[in-house]
């Protein structure tokens, strides 16, 4: 690897396990950590350990939590008949930042992707079906990414859930705020026209 002391080499290697962290960035981070005062290093160590040891999936929705069920599932002010289906826990956080959705969530932990060998059985669909049948869900908002895999997952969910009398909706997508039409691709423009609404 390099002529650095073994502990630094191990730290660089460990940091490079993180997504988006290449060898150079891992090296910079390692040297930054080595130069940090002991209190901050201990805080970092504790935060890493706690995140790994004390965070788990909610038994109801599969969102990441440190209590079971999670605070969203426990919140009685939320509409229990409305579930937003997302790919992973980061999507829950993104939607919650908007502070507009007042239903509950279900985290699929992925999307259907035959190219990656991920089929419906690899997703958290059984738990979703159990919730739909046991909790009286009336609407499912599918909030998977607008990709081929996200669309395939949305279509599969629609076929699976619609026969149960549950309304299945999809998040609208199209042009971003502040975007220029001239830079939009054809698919985005098509979806923007399909999702248009009356003013």
Swiss-Prot record:
Pfam families: RecR_C, RecR_HhH, RecR_ZnF, Toprim_4. One of its GO terms (biological process) is DNA repair. One of its GO terms (molecular function) is zinc ion binding. PROSITE patterns: RECR, TOPRIM. Signal peptide: none annotated. Keywords: DNA damage, DNA recombination, DNA repair, Metal-binding, Zinc, Zinc-finger. Gene3D superfamilies: 3.30.60.80, 3.40.1360.10, 6.10.250.240, RecR Domain 1. A zinc finger (C4-type) spans 58-73. Residues 81-176 form the Toprim domain. InterPro entries: DNA_Rcmb_RecR, Rcmb_RecR, Rcmb_RecR_Znf, TOPRIM_dom, TOPRIM_RecR. NCBIfam families: recR (TIGR00615). Belongs to the RecR family. May play a role in DNA repair. It seems to be involved in an RecBC-independent recombinational process of DNA repair. It may act with RecF and RecO. HAMAP family: RecR (MF_00017). This is Recombination protein RecR. It comes from Natranaerobius thermophilus (strain ATCC BAA-1301 / DSM 18059 / JW/NM-WN-LF).
């Amino acid at each position: 690897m390099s002529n650095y002391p073994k502990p630094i080499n191990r730290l660089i290697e460990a940091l490079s396990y993180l997504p988006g962290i290449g060898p150079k960035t891992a090296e910079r981070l390692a040297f930054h950590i080595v130069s940090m005062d002991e209190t901050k290093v201990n805080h970092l160590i504790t935060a890493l350990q706690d995140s790994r040891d004390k965070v788990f999936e909610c038994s109801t929705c599969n969102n990441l939590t440190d209590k079971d069920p999670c605070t969203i599932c426990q919140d009685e002010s939320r509409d229990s008949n409305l579930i937003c289906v997302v790919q992973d826990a980061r999507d829950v956080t993104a939607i919650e930042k908007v502070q507009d959705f007042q239903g509950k969530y279900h985290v699929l932990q992925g999307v259907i992707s035959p190219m990656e060998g991920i089929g419906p059985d690899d997703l958290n669909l059984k738990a979703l079906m159990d919730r739909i049948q046991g909790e009286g869900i009336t609407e499912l908002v599918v909030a998977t990414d607008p990709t081929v895999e996200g669309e395939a997952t949305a279509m599969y969910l629609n076929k699976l859930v619609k026969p149960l009398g549950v309304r299945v909706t999809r998040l609208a997508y199209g042009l971003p705020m502040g975007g220029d039409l001239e830079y939009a691709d054809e698919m985005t423009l098509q979806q923007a026209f399909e999702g248009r609404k009356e003013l």
